Amino acid sequence: MATFKEHLQERSAHSIGRVNAHGYEDSNFLLTKLTENKMSCPMTISMLAPTLGTVGRINEESRTRRNAGYPINFEFDFGPVIEFLNMRLNNAGDPFMECNYGIHSKKFEIAVLDWFARLWELPKDQYWGYVTSGGTEGNMHGLLVGRELFPEGIIYTSCDSHYSIFKAAKMYRVQCIKIDTLFSGEMDYADFRRKLLQNTRSPAIVNVNIGTTMKGAVDDLDEVVMILENCGFANRFYIHCDSALVGLMMPFIKQAPKLTFKKPIGSICISGHKFIGCPIPCGVLITRLMDINHVMSTNIEYISSNDTTIAGSRNGHAPIFLWYALKRIGYNGLCKTVENCLKNAQYLALRLREMGVSVFLNALSITVVFERPNDETFVRKWQLACQGKIAHVVVMPNVSLERINMFLEEFTKSRIALHQDKCVAGDVSQENCLCSLHLDRKKEAV
């Protein structure tokens, strides 16, 4: 029986174009044709190799080692599946439908989707989903389904939401109401209730953050549902959960609130290149099949598939990498990894506080928020994500205790050299601010 790889090779061989003995398009042939073009750049492989080698060394030795501000997991080794990059995989159209283009990885994609549907407790015959290009596309799709179900609806989302939520509202020309947040980054539920009551005639399309971008705050899904029902929106709301980073972690944290389709939510999306560490930017969206069948089931004859996704042509390599990562680490591995990240985040927050740095860490979060360093060279060196007066470190699996201690040592030297004393009470609360003003007030209170 032919393997999946052999099956793809056979399909590739029947595609129009020149193929080699392995069934792949001949890259040397393509390169020759490219360089024969008089308008092409006269660069040879020998000229290109040193440049690529230098870039690779820089990325590996300095960038990768000191990436602290952005949630990327560098721990996974995808060597065993790298050779699939030689294949021209395109998961065009609906993942559950065979399309006319036969070189795809939809079987892997469905396996990944099944895994997440089980994780979030949506039965196999009731879910639909696909592997997206990332969290932004997942948010765009979730909100689009909400808009199609409730054309007159208003989008409600907190001020701390990812910028893609506001982008989607603008693209779809849907009114978007921003909800105030607490200093923690969590939605201000009193403000949410107040703004709902000002617009009772229009259905509510609500984005619930399961881990905000800057502070890792988790909105209370149960509280949001209760407020919607108490304000007269029963059966007139759609909830999308932006779970880019934390959505994969929460099911493995015993004390965490449950993220499940047993609650009245419409869709959940995560990023595949963050906690899982897929080397290709991607994501996963899971939603309810009945909603897709109701609002997004137009058939496209050209590809012999339904138009249910945002993108037409979709990356066929990402599902293979996601499948491999999930199979390799497993449920037990994810439990241990999540637990270790939480412990390391608490360690970093404690050490920063001992250094006299204003710091804040949400419960059950791996995003450590602290005063923005004045040294921009240090910020760039550690690739810190900054916003106003604050910065953060996202303690991913590759951010080990060794790297945390290295970061702390360099940050200490930087602060001493620049005599940093910054008030960030407005961002982390007076209780967590350790500037000279608030330290003096605390001493006076004692």
Swiss-Prot record:
The modification N6-(pyridoxal phosphate)lysine is found at K274. Its EC number is 4.1.1.-. It catalyses: L-serine + H(+) = ethanolamine + CO2. GO terms for biological process: carboxylic acid metabolic process. Its cofactor is pyridoxal 5'-phosphate. Gene3D superfamilies: Aspartate Aminotransferase, domain 1, Type I PLP-dependent aspartate aminotransferase-like (Major domain). It holds the Pfam family Pyridoxal_deC. PROSITE patterns: DDC_GAD_HDC_YDC. GO terms for molecular function: pyridoxal phosphate binding; serine decarboxylase activity. SUPFAM superfamilies: PLP-dependent transferases (SSF53383). Catalyzes the biosynthesis of ethanolamine from serine. Decarboxylation of free serine is the major source of ethanolamine production in plants and ethanolamine metabolism is crucial for the synthesis of choline, phosphatidylethanolamine (PE) and phosphatidylcholine (PC), and thus for plant growth. Belongs to the group II decarboxylase family. NCBIfam families: PRK02769.1. This is Serine decarboxylase 3.
